[in-house]
Amino acid sequence: KFKNNEPKKNIISFSLWGDNENYTKGAILNATLAPVIYPEWTCRFYCDKNSVPEEVINKLISLGSEVLFLENNNLAYFGLFWRFFVIDDLNVDRYIIRDCDCIITVQEKLAVDEWINSGKNFHIMRDYASHTELIHAGLWGGITGVIPDMTTLIINYYNSTHKERTIDQRFLRDCIWPILKDCYYCNDSNYNFDNISNNYKNLGRLPINLNIGINW
C-alpha cells in the first residue's frame, strides 16, 4: 500500500557529483519543485562529499531533501549507480530514479500515480522517439524488496564490464530487466512495447516541443 502521508518512505533518488551547474542547479530546482509536484515523496541526493559545492549541499538540505555522502574514488562512471542504492534501503517502500539535469514535471507525476494505482512492482517511462531502451536510467522506479542485493549486483557488474557513459543503461538492460519484465507498468508516448504500454493523459501534458527526460 502506498503511504501518501509518509514521504520519507517514498524516495526520488538522484546521483550528484562535481560542480557542473547543469547538475547542481538542476538538483536545486528539482528539490524546490518536489514538495509541490511530489508532496508524498522526498528527494534524496547521493553526493560526492569531495566535489559538490558546500552551498549546493546546504541548499538541498534547506529545501527538505536528504543528502547522503559517498566518495567517487576515481571510479569511472560509478557515480551513475549511486542513485540505485536506494533500492537496498529497508526504510524505503517505493523509489523513483531520476537525473539531476532533467526537471520533474506534472506529466511524470500523473504517470507515477497511474503506476501506483496499477499495483505493479515497477514503473518505466519513455516519452521521445529516441527513448528505445528497455529501461532508461533516469525514468524508472519500483518497490523495495523485489530486487535482491542491488549493491552486490552493481559491484559485480561494474567490475566485469567496460566503463563508459552508458554503463548504467547496460546494467539495467542486462541485470534488472529480467527481474522486472513480468510486473511493470509502462507509460510510452511513441511505442507500444509488448502491447502493454500506456500513453500519457492529456491533463498535465508538456508542450509539444518538450518531453519527460529532456535535459533542461
Regions from the language model: what does each represent?
Residues 91-93:
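Active-site acidic short loop of glycosyltransferases
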Residues 86, 122-124, 139-141, 171:
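Conserved hydrophobic/aromatic beta-strand scaffold that supports enzyme active sites
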Residues 129-132, 141-216:
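Catalytic core and acceptor-binding pocket of nucleotide-sugar-dependent glycosyltransferases
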